[in-house]
Structures are given as structure tokens and as C-alpha cells.
């Protein structure tokens, strides 16, 4: 019984090795074309045999030893040994010789204007000595008590800033000081920057701009104050003894 099992395993091993060798022999060689080495017309058998006699060395339609339609030894439709659609060799389909790759996705282009603008904004803030630049805001709707000024603001609001410069709120004792400093530095920087571009502001522009920037600075103060108190509350919460004891107990349970 043992000998019969050993013989069966030897037979299975022999069959597996023989099958692997057979598959290796059947693998196509690189560089050959479709139906290379055959002498029949691909896909259409002729009842009377080949209609035309072979011409030296290759199969039917192989004048120089290649596959069907291989005048120089390439694959099917390969006149010079490349891939299908490669008249002069090369890579994949549509990559023949000096031709560019067909339908190749182009690389995304970097918007240099955005990069330059970001770099300039960072340089201006760095040169102001501790001032930060707030996020962009929608320009507020303000009534100035004069039809002329209201109309002037609606027609020229795009010329006024939509961001403000400010220092951290913990450096000021109250909102008025924060807003006053914020308005002065923002109007000054916007006026200087715009003047260097060849555009001047009138007295009406300055008056309207100060009102607009004041409202924006108030909004910025409210945002910064809320964020500051939330950070302070988080620090107080996690520094209290009960919370520290609870966290230590949880760490002990996890580690232990």
C-alpha cells in the first residue's frame, strides 16, 4: 500500500513537471507576429490548398521569413519590425519613430500668477513686523447718508481692500484699539500698493475706504476673539486635575 502511494506521488510530480515544460515551449517568442511560422491564410482555409506557392524559407506570404504580412520579419502589419501601427519600430501603438504618443495626457500647468501673488503677500506680512493678513471677506453693504457717496461706493467698491492686516488680539486691551490699529495699517498698505500701480485715491475714496475697512476690522476682531477664547478654554480644560487624573487612568488601563 505504501509503495502504491509513493508511486502515485511520483507519477503526479512527473505529470506536473511535464506540463510545465510543455507550457514553456508553447510561450510565444518576442518579436514574432501573428500567425508567424504558419503557411495557411489566417482564418480562411482553402479547399484546394494554398493558391500561391511558397516563396523561399517562410510561410505563405512570407517573402523574407516573417509572419503573414511580414515583409521584413515583424508582426502582422509590421513592415519594419515594430508593433502594430509602428512603421519604423518603437514602443506601443501610435509610437512609431519620431511621432509623438497619441492621446497622451498633458501635465497640469502651474498658475505662476497665483504663486507670485502668494509669495508677495507673504513678503508684505513679513515686512510689517508681526501683522497678519486676514482671510478674504465680502465687502460690507454700507449706507453713508449721502446718495452720492452710496452710489460712489457701489461703483468703486472693487478698488477697496477685501482683507485686513491685524495683530493678535491678546496684544490689545479692547476692541477699539484693535480696530483703530487694523484700519490704519490696512488703509496705509492698500494706498501705497495701489499708488505704485499708477492709481491715485481722492478724499472721497479715503473716507469711504476707512468706513469699509472699519467694518471689516470689527468682523476680524470678533473672529479672532472667539478663536482665542476657545483655545484658552481648551487649555484650561485639559490642565485641570480631574482631567489629568482621568487621562492618566486611561493610559494605565491601555498600557497595563
UniProtKB/Swiss-Prot annotation:
Q: Which residues form the propeptide?
A: 234-256
Q: Which domain of life is it from?
A: Eukaryota
Q: What keywords were assigned to this record? A: Amyloid, Cell membrane, Copper, Disulfide bond, Glycoprotein, Golgi apparatus, GPI-anchor, Lipoprotein, Membrane, Metal-binding, Prion, Repeat, Signal, Zinc
Q: Where is this region: 5 X 8 AA tandem repeats of P-H-G-G-G-W-G-Q?
A: 54-95
| Localization annotation | Cell membrane; Golgi apparatus
* Region (Interaction with GRB2, ERI3 and SYN1) residue spans: 25-233
Q: Where does Cu(2+) 3 bind?
A: 80-82
- Principal cellular location given in the protein's record: membrane
- The UniProt record lists lipidation (GPI-anchor amidated alanine) at 233
PROSITE patterns, per database record: PRION_1, PRION_2
Q: List the disulfide bonds.
A: 182-217
Residues linked to a glycan: 184, 200
Q: Name one GO molecular function term.
A: copper ion binding
What are the boundaries of the signal sequence?
A: 1-24
Q: List positions binding Cu(2+) 1.
A: 64-66
- Binding-site residues, Cu(2+) 2: 72-74
Residue span of region Disordered = 28-110
Q: What residue spans carry the Gly residues bias annotation?
A: 55-97
The record's annotation in PANTHER family points to: DOPPEL PRION, MAJOR PRION PROTEIN
Q: What's noted about domains in the record? A: The normal, monomeric form has a mainly alpha-helical structure. The disease-associated, protease-resistant form forms amyloid fibrils containing a cross-beta spine, formed by a steric zipper of superposed beta-strands. Disease mutations may favor intermolecular contacts via short beta strands, and may thereby trigger oligomerization.
State what protein this is by name: Major prion protein
| Species annotation | Budorcas taxicolor
